[in-house]
Amino acid sequence: MESIQALAQLLSSMHVVDLSPTLYTNMPGWHSHPNVMIVEDARNFAQNGYFLQTLLLPEHSGCHVDAPAHVLPDKADQTIDIFPANSLFGVAKKIDLSQEHYLPGDLAPLSKVEEVMAQTGIAIEKGDIVLFDFGYDQYLVDVEKKPASQRNWWGENEPGLAEDVCRFLFEKGVRAVGSDTPACDMAQVNGQITAGFGHRKYFLPNGIFIIEGLYGLAQVPASFYFMAMPLKIKGGSGSPLRPIAIF
């Protein structure tokens, strides 16, 4: 009991930052996935005596996690519902690449990642959750009422991670890799994938989760405690998340 009270007191004294975007109809997402749809008055006070919305959304909506089954036919049994609820709890290390102004199709090399690590005084260790801040969540700000071409740009354009970065993270034995882009390690230009070494080679085949669509990484320090839980979707290829940073 004393340990629980101590934990509660500790948590109440710390900062908590939400790292997810708000879900809404036709929000930006991966260009070939179905759109998010929210039926706002599925039930209403006038007809039903209460208010309720109906959500129609792909598993990979907003901030979300990819399970190995998402892209690997030989791991079709590794769906999101089989993993423990605390699979995405752990120490997070942020790699801030936002000042590099990477363009869609660019690949961040290991030399730059190591430079940022040295500048911020962090080291990647086994079990870490490594999150890349490309500054691409700026393209999710106030886009809800913009034309579809502008709203969808984020889901079709992104920088990615060079192969040496993906190999480095695999060799370090990290728990998960994430970013504020739609596909983390993958680079694409106008919906055409130009590179992607993590999904099918270094990350998912080796049990390293991929977190995509993070929002607000600029608000958190270089190291913090990360918590996120996926929905327990039977046979799910992934799940939406509401991740938080605690520091």
Task: State where each predicted segment sits.
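Active-/binding-site microenvironments in catalytic and ligand-binding cores
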Residues: M1-F247
